[in-house]
Amino acid sequence: MSSKILLTNLRTSASFCKTLKFPQRPRTPFIASQQSCAIHVDNPPSIPTLTTSYVHGLSSHPLQSSTVDQCLQATVERYPDREAMVFVQDGIRKTFAEFYQDVEKAAAGLLAAGLKRGDRLGMWGPNIYEWVLMQFATAKAGIILVAVNPAYQLQEVEFALRKVQCNAVVCPTKFKSQHYCDMLKQLCPEMETASPGGIKSSRLPDLHTVIVTDSQQPGSFLLKDLMQAGSSQHYQQLQDLQKKLVCDDPINIQFTSGTTGKPKGATLSHHNIVNNAYFTGMRIGYNWRKNVRICLPVPLYHCFGSVGGGVIMALYGTTVIFPSTGYDGRANLRAIEKEKCTFVYGTPTMYIDMLGQPDLAKFDLSSVRGGIAAGSPCPPEVMRKILNVMGIKEMVIGYGTTENSPVTFCGFPVDSAERKIVTVGCISPHTEAKVVDPTTGEIVPLGAQGELMIRGYCVMLEYWQDEEKTRECITKDRWYKTGDIASLDQFAYCKIEGRIKDLIIRGGENIYPAEIEQFLHTHPKILEAQVVGVKDERMGEEVCACIRLKEGQECTVEEIKAYCKGKIAHYKVPRYILFVQDYPLTITGKIQKHKLRERTEKQLGL
C-alpha cells in the first residue's frame, strides 16, 4: 500500500471516529509511587510486591491492534476444518471455514439491506447460531451490534432500541413465551404494509430493517434470503471497508444488566474486547492448550458469553459448545459428557444448579480440566464443591463488569485452592486497579477495604450518548468506579467484599451481606443464601436471610439462628429468615437485590 493511500485511509478513519465523539484512550501519567507498584502477571506473582492498594499489571505481551474480523480470519486460515461451534439442541455444527463463509454472506447481505458503517443492529434472542453469526457479520461490516436482552418485554425493548437509535433488528419469530415478532409489530404496526428494509416507524423512527431468522414476516427479511442478496458490488464494498475499519471503532453496545434503574448502553470497541479476550484466554492457557472445547451455557447477550465465548473462539481457535437455547442445568451436564468438553463457563447460580442435580454423579465429567465462574460473587463453599465434587481442579474466578469489557481480575489455573476460594484472582495485564476511600478518594492502605477503581484499555468508550451517566462512573482521568467494596493483597490478588449499594447499616454497624451469605453456605442443608437489609423503625435496617434449601431438606428458623450464634457477631445474625424457592434474576443470572428486598419487605409486612 502506498503512503498516500495509507494516509488517506487514516484520515478517513480519523474523520469517522471524530463524528462519533468518543473519548480517546488516555496516556497514563507517570506517577512515581504507582510505578513502584507495577507487577508482572504473565505468570502467578511469587514475590510480594505491592505496598499500597494500587497495582498496574505488566506483561511481556503487547496490546493487540487487530479488529475482530482480522482475528477470526487469521484463525480460519490456521484451522479451517476445526469445529468452531456446536449448538447441541439445534443440531448445528460449523467448522471455522463454514462459519466464515456464512459471516461473509451475512455481512454482504447487511450492506445490501442498506446498512452502513456505524449503524446499530439489535440482536434480540436466546443462544442460537444466528446470534454468533450476527456478532461477526456486523463486525466485518463495521456495524455496531447491540446486544438486546432476550427477556425484554414490550416497554423494555422499546426503551433499548430508542436509546441507541437502532437501525435494524435481528430476531427469531419466538422463543418459549417470548413472541419477538409480535412485539415488534406492536411497536411498529407499519411493518404490516412496509417492504423489507423500508419500515418507517413513528415510535422507532431510526428503525428501517427487521431480519427474522426462522420465518417470513411482513415487512421483514428472512435471514437465509438476505444471505444470498449480496452482489459482487456489495462484496467489493465489504472488501474496501476492511481497509477503513480500525481497532478504536465501536463494535458492540452491551446494556448493563439493570439490577437497579434503567439499563445503560456500555459502548465497547474492537480494542476493548479483542484485548480482553486475548489476555483472559492467555491467563487460562488457551494459547498453548490443544483441543479446547468450551461448554458455554451463559447468555450471548452478556459480555461473558459474547467475549469469553465468541471472541476467544476467534482468537484461539477454541470450539464452543452451546448446550441449549435457554439455560438448562441438566443440558449442561449432558453436553459436557457427550461433547467431551474440556472447559465449562457459568455464573455461580449455574454451578449451584449443576451441583444440585440429584444424579450428578452419573454424568461423566472426566474430560473437564478447567472453567470460569463469573458474573456475580461466588460463595467460597460453592467453589469448594466445584473443585472437589465436580472435580474441576483448574477452575478460576473471573471478575469484571460490562463496562470493563468485562474481565479485570482472573485467577490462574494453578492457583492454590485457598486463593480460588477467597479471591477473584490476580490483576489482568495492562490494567490498573486501586482501592480508595469512597468519601475522600484517597488510596487506602494495603489490605484495607474501599471502593475498587479500574483504568486501562478495558474501560468502555462511554454509555451510548449519555454524558451524564458516563461522568458519574468514569473520572476525568479515566478511572472507572466499580461500586464494589474490595481489598488487594501483596501479590495483586483481589477480594470482593460486597457492593456499596448493598451495604446494610444496622444501628450504625456496617454489615456486608456477602460475609453472612458465605457463612450460611457452610450449613449442610443450605443450597443458596442471599442476604438483604430490610427497613426497621428502631435500627434503621435489619438483616434478612432468604434461603434455598437442598432438595429433600427441611429446616427451621430457630435451627439457622442457632447455627449462627457464637460463630458470627450478634448483630450479623439475621433477624428475619425466609425459606424461598427462587430469587429474582437478570437474564445473566445475577441476583436482583433491590427486587428481592422489595419482595421480602412485602412478605414480612414492613
Curated annotation (Swiss-Prot):
Keywords: ATP-binding, Fatty acid metabolism, Ligase, Lipid metabolism, Mitochondrion, Nucleotide-binding, Transit peptide. Acyl-CoA synthases catalyze the initial reaction in fatty acid metabolism, by forming a thioester with CoA. Has some preference toward medium-chain substrates. Plays a role in adipocyte differentiation. Its EC number is 6.2.1.2. The lineage of its organism: Eukaryota, Metazoa, Chordata, Craniata, Vertebrata. One of its GO terms (biological process) is fatty acid metabolic process. It catalyses: a medium-chain fatty acid + ATP + CoA = a medium-chain fatty acyl-CoA + AMP + diphosphate; octanoate + ATP + CoA = octanoyl-CoA + AMP + diphosphate. GO terms for molecular function: ATP binding; medium-chain fatty acid-CoA ligase activity. One of its GO terms (cellular component) is mitochondrion. InterPro entries: AMP-bd_C, AMP-bd_C_sf, AMP-binding_CS, AMP-dep_synth/lig_dom, ANL_N_sf. Its main location: mitochondrion. Belongs to the ATP-dependent AMP-binding enzyme family. ATP binds at residues 256-264, 484, 499, 590. Residues 1-13 form a transit peptide. This is Medium-chain acyl-CoA ligase ACSF2, mitochondrial. It is found in: Mitochondrion.
